């Protein structure tokens, strides 16, 4: 019943809502977060309060938390805040043993912190009728007709807060694929770049605020790099290509997970020409199903149900 819910849109510039947020953080029995929130560092939870980290992805190719290479450049005050926030995560929801190990290293947690119930955000992909509906809906919006849809969704890079530069040669992609494909461009909401000039009969720029789970059902081929999208898209078992043009630089500055090249379920390219050749020759990995099974081990379409059961148990114990 939404009438029983109090939606507070948090904004650093909205003092009233900020105070409201802090009130709820200090009075709630169960707190769900899906990212790093510095506000947690300012809260001292009472006994019995459980903060559960849902996270915003069911897998990781880039390092984060204490594993992030840039952590060495942060101040002692920053590190103290990180520690305070991470220590509030009493449970972390995971969809696989692999992701559990990453969380343990990234947040300095142990096995008892892991809630192996599957990732709730993946439940939607198991609703076949809904996915078919979304596929038809978005293909109609794209005017795809008899064409296949390629989605290019690069990961966010820290320097793109000021200005981003797209390395992909879109003219070459159009010459190679415009007869049989459409190229859909989906950038991170924080990226600042003018892409209106890229809108053509071949290239479609999707609003940055459109949720990815809305689009994936309509996608036939995914192109990305270090994003977590492949872990969800792999549930469809459709081809994935990795346009990792700055792999060495990114690994040095931010950090990729160990054995990145062996883990990903598709070929790597560092130039648009290589990428085009890979797509044309269909040199996709044969391990998509194994990759999905491994990283979505506990995600079976019922993770949200198990999450609700767990939360109800916590609330009952609080009575």
Region spans (language model):
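Donor nucleotide-activated moiety binding/catalytic core segment of transferases
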Residues: 15-28, 189-231
